[in-house]
Amino acid sequence: MSNPRSLEEEKYDMSGARLALILCVTKAREGSEEDLDALEHMFRQLRFESTMKRDPTAEQFQEELEKFQQAIDSREDPVSCAFVVLMAHGREGFLKGEDGEMVKLENLFEALNNKNCQALRAKPKVYIIQACRGEQRDPGETVGGDEIVMVIKDSPQTIPTYTDALHVYSTVEGYIAYRHDQKGSCFIQTLVDVFTKRKGHILELLTEVTRRMAEAELVQEGKARKTNPEIQSTLRKRLYLQ
């Protein structure tokens, strides 16, 4: 019987290029520039090559993701990881472009999946979404079926289309996202602070982001509000950024 392997060994190889794409609608979104500055600082510190586009239309959101995918697949050097940061007004499942038209998030996620981006197959793809997902506001609270048989193979020759992806939303489904008109968004500023000052795999870092946001109290129009991010992961290994 072979000795069990430590989970610490199961981590993504980050020796290749690290790439990031930032798409941000600044129109009628005061505080966006502070978020952009913070993200640029974070990506420099984490040794990412970052590309930024301000005020994309709905169509340009899709076009920029496709251009990013093509640039990744055409690189001669190996790519280890890709980040995509999307910041705009929105509602559940959609972002609003600078032109007021909507683009479906699901379509944006398609560009870098294991089927459409060969260079990122089995590589981590992280999406950071700073946008409202509804109209609700959280005031805070005081503190069987049929059996399914699963067969595991030691050396799989194929992987699912949507593995190795991490979607991080600034708020939970149905709720608005908060942004200060001078200091930027609570979510982006907290994420940058944790990612640049703390070490650990990315899900540990995001747990710390969630803790800080959940414990913070926001005030909007004189009323106390609470908020926390939502994390959806299909990562198969640990992802360390530093």
Swiss-Prot record:
Propeptide: 1-5, 147-152
Location of the protein in the cell: Cytoplasm; Nucleus
GO biological process, one term: keratinization
Gene3D superfamilies on file: 3.40.50.1460
Primary location: cytoplasm
Modification after translation (UniProt): Maturation by proteolytic processing appears to be a two-step process. The precursor is processed by KLK7 to yield the p20/p8 intermediate form which acts on the precursor to yield the p17/p10 mature form. Initially, cleavage between Ile-152 and Lys-153 has been proposed to yield the large and small subunits of the active enzyme.
PROSITE patterns per UniProt: CASPASE_CYS (PS01122), CASPASE_P10 (PS50207), CASPASE_P20 (PS50208)
A Gene Ontology molecular function term of the record: cysteine-type endopeptidase activity
Induction: In undifferentiated keratinocytes under postconfluency growth conditions (in vitro). By high glucose in retinal pigment epithelia cells.
Domain of life where this protein originates: Eukaryota
Keywords: Cytoplasm, Differentiation, Hydrolase, Ichthyosis, Nucleus, Protease, Thiol protease, Zymogen
Tissue-level expression: Expressed in keratinocytes of adult skin suprabasal layers (from spinous layers to the stratum granulosum and stratum corneum) (at protein level). Expressed in keratinocytes of hair shaft and sebaceous glands (at protein level). In psoriatic skin only expressed at very low levels. The p17/10 mature form is expressed in epidermis stratum corneum, the p20/p8 intermediate form in epidermis upper granular cells of the stratum granulosum.
Enzyme class: hydrolase
Activity control, per UniProt: Inhibited by caspase-1 inhibitor YVAD-FMK and the pan-caspase inhibitor VAD-FMK.
SUPFAM superfamilies: Caspase-like
GO cellular component: cornified envelope; cytoplasm; cytosol; keratin filament; mitochondrion; nucleoplasm; nucleus
Assigned EC number: 3.4.22.-
InterPro entries in the cross-refs: Caspase-like_dom_sf, Caspase_cys_AS, Pept_C14, Pept_C14_caspase, Pept_C14_p10, Pept_C14_p20, Pept_C14A
List of catalytic residues: H89, C132
Protein role: Non-apoptotic caspase involved in epidermal differentiation. Is the predominant caspase in epidermal stratum corneum. Seems to play a role in keratinocyte differentiation and is required for cornification. Regulates maturation of the epidermis by proteolytically processing filaggrin. In vitro has a preference for the substrate [WY]-X-X-D motif and is active on the synthetic caspase substrate WEHD-ACF. Involved in processing of prosaposin in the epidermis. May be involved in retinal pigment epithelium cell barrier function.
Disorder association: Ichthyosis, congenital, autosomal recessive 12: A form of autosomal recessive congenital ichthyosis, a disorder of keratinization with abnormal differentiation and desquamation of the epidermis, resulting in abnormal skin scaling over the whole body. The main skin phenotypes are lamellar ichthyosis (LI) and non-bullous congenital ichthyosiform erythroderma (NCIE), although phenotypic overlap within the same patient or among patients from the same family can occur.
Subunit record text: Heterodimer of a large and a small subunit, both processed from the precursor; the mature active form is a p17/p10 dimer and the intermediate form a p20/p8 dimer.
Family under the similarity heading: Belongs to the peptidase C14A family.
Extra information: Expressed in bacteria requires high concentrations of kosmotropic salts to be activated. The mature and the intermediate form differ in activity towards synthetic caspase substrates: the p17/p10 mature form but not the p20/p8 intermediate form is active on WEHD-MCA; p20/p8 is active on a number of other caspase substrates without any marked preference (VEID-AFC, DEVD-AFC, LEVD-AFC and LEHD-AFC).
Protein name per UniProt: Caspase-14
Gene: CASP14
